[in-house]
């Protein structure tokens, strides 16, 4: 019985020895990790460089050689911190360089809103134009017959067009009116051939000559309608059936 218990007592320390060695190794690794992190809990730049695989000095020298005087070597530490923060390693946060007043300047924001307001007005104006809403300028265009400039007068066709469209009155010159009056006193009604000749001689269209004669005949009828129809004065004995009265001569013998 004494011989069987002695080997088991000797084997127990041997079995517990690896456990103590593993615990000592884990404690040493944890102590090394805590020592590497440091008292502040933030890794140093050298440790970050070894972890990320980025050397600030090498990158700074390469960038200086490539860009020359345009590269600032002092920004290498900021680049390292940026890569550390992007990898989620909790690198040191550097303040943003430059003036931050522009980010919160109320005048800049108000100017931005003003520009947005003006752009909105332009969009509203475009919408109004699409909807057909007319303003003062549109009313002026309607009053002027849609002509913006004096030379943009609307000339209607003399041969056709819509019946509901009002035609522009033809402005006859003084010479044309004089020649038409002469022709009217000669002939109240013109034939087709004569109408074409008059239109060609006065540089007018056949329709213009026809309309002028129609208006002139209406004017002539109105003038004669207002006048009383009085017979002309005849001289005494001019149209009597008998000859002039003569006294007989008694002393002819």
UniProtKB/Swiss-Prot annotation:
Keyword Transcription carried by entry: yes
SUPFAM superfamilies: Homeodomain-like (SSF46689)
GO cellular component, one term: nucleus
GO BP of this protein: anterior/posterior pattern specification; positive regulation of DNA-templated transcription; positive regulation of mesodermal cell fate specification; positive regulation of transcription by RNA polymerase II; positive regulation of vulval development; regulation of cell division; regulation of cell fate specification
Biased amino acid composition, Low complexity: 1-46
DNA-binding region per UniProt: 165-224
Motif (Antp-type hexapeptide): 148-153
PROSITE patterns: ANTENNAPEDIA (PS00032), HOMEOBOX_1 (PS00027), HOMEOBOX_2 (PS50071)
Claim: Calcium is one of the keywords in the record: no
Primary location group: nucleus
One of the record's GO molecular function terms: RNA polymerase II cis-regulatory region sequence-specific DNA binding
Keyword terms, alphabetized: Developmental protein, DNA-binding, Homeobox, Nucleus, Transcription, Transcription regulation
Location(s), subcellular: Nucleus
CDD domains attached to this UniProt entry: homeodomain
Phenotype of gene-disrupted mutants: Lin-39 and mab-5 double mutants have reduced sex myoblast specification-specific expression of sem-2 in the developing mesoderm. RNAi-mediated knockdown in L1-stage larvae significantly reduces the fraction of unfused P5.p-P7.p cells that express egl-18 and elt-6.
Cross-referenced InterPro entries: Antp_homeobox_Deformed_sf (IPR050609), HD (IPR001356), HD_metazoa (IPR020479), Homeobox_antennapedia (IPR017995), Homeobox_Antennapedia_CS (IPR001827), Homeobox_CS (IPR017970), Homeodomain-like_sf (IPR009057)
Region Disordered: start-end pairs: 1-53, 115-148
Function of the protein: Transcription factor. Binds to the consensus 5'-TGATNNAT(G/T)(G/A)-3' PBC/Hox motif of target genes to regulate gene expression; sem-2 in order to promote cell fate specification in the postembryonic mesoderm (also known as the M lineage), and egl-18 and elt-6 to regulate vulval development. May bind to the PBC/Hox motif as a heterodimer with homeobox protein ceh-20. Regulates vulval precursor cell (VPC) differentiation, in concert with orphan nuclear receptor nhr-25.
Subunit structure: Interacts with nhr-25.
Family: Belongs to the Antp homeobox family. Deformed subfamily.
Protein's recorded name: Homeobox protein lin-39
Source organism of the structure: Caenorhabditis elegans
Gene name for this UniProt entry: lin-39
